[in-house]
Design a protein with these regions (language model features):
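C-terminal cap of thioredoxin/glutaredoxin-like
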Residues: 119-199
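Soluble periplasmic/extracytoplasmic beta-strand elements of cell-envelope proteins
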Residues: 35-38, 69-72, 162-164, 178
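A short beta-strand-turn-helix
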Residues: 17-34, 62
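Structural alpha/beta surface segment adjacent to cysteine/selenocysteine redox centers
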Residues: 32, 40-123, 195-198
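N-terminal targeting signals for export/organelle localization
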Residues: 1-18, 178
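Alpha-helical scaffolding within the catalytic cores
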Residues: 21-22, 54-56, 150
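Acidic/histidine-rich, surface-exposed loop or edge segments in extracytoplasmic proteins
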Residues: 37-42, 173
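Residue-level signature of catalytic and energy-coupling elements of molecular machines
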Residues: 36, 44, 132
Length: 199
């Protein structure tokens, strides 16, 4: 557990977060008093297992009920991986508003060769292939991916997945804790329930 930092306004719980939520995949109400920032790598087996076996229940019980807000930084502790096409593809899927719908597919093809990877994602009926092609050539996408890696580095992660959890109390004070690794559903449920009980 890390020392709490004061949020400037209790009514706006995103104030004081360790990373920016703008222009990244986010689910949940912005009034939630618990905000999770997940650092995830598409080539990480534990990350994939978490999203297949744990996240759906957390999404149903905590995110969709307005208790928890969930944001994702797609990165790793290896800076050289930022040049992998999978991260740009994820960014472009997000720009078309289809990140969450394509998440399982991105995990399943992440280890393929870049040219094959792009072709497979472009075939998705959820995406506009023309927009995807334009997006992948947009320098701002590469800049956004690099920024994701920079933010992950500032959080000093030592592996993926890592979950940075912020909790706001009624007086606007923020406390921060970290969960490392793809823990069980029960582990996350206990952690969230304990945080949500705090005033």
């Amino acid at each position: 557990m890390f020392p709490g930092t004061a949020a400037s306004r209790a009514a706006e719980p995103r104030v004081g977060l360790p990373v920016e939520l703008t222009d990244r995949p986010v689910l949940g109400a912005n009034t939630a008093t618990v905000v999770v920032v997940e650092i995830s790598n598409f080539k990480c087996t534990q990350c994939r297992n978490f999203h297949e076996n744990v996240f759906p229940t957390l999404r149903r019980d905590y995110i969709e009920t307005g208790k928890v807000r969930w944001a994702v930084i797609n990165a790793s502790d290896d800076e050289s991986e930022q040049y992998g096409k999978i991260f740009s593809l994820a960014r472009c899927a997000h720009r078309q508003g289809k990140y969450w719908e394509l998440l399982d597919g991105l995990f399943s093809v992440a280890h393929r060769a870049p040219s094959v990877l792009e072709a497979l994602v472009a075939k998705s009926p959820l995406l506009d292939a023309g927009e995807l092609e334009i997006c992948l050539k947009d320098r701002s996408v590469r800049t956004a991916v690099a920024k994701d890696f920079e933010q992950a580095a500032r959080l000093k992660i030592r592996g993926t997945p890592t979950f940075v959890i912020s909790k706001w109390s009624a007086d606007g004070t923020r406390t921060e804790s970290t969960i490392a690794g793809a823990q069980s559903l029960e582990y996350f449920q206990r952690a969230f329930d304990a945080l949500l009980k705090k005033p």
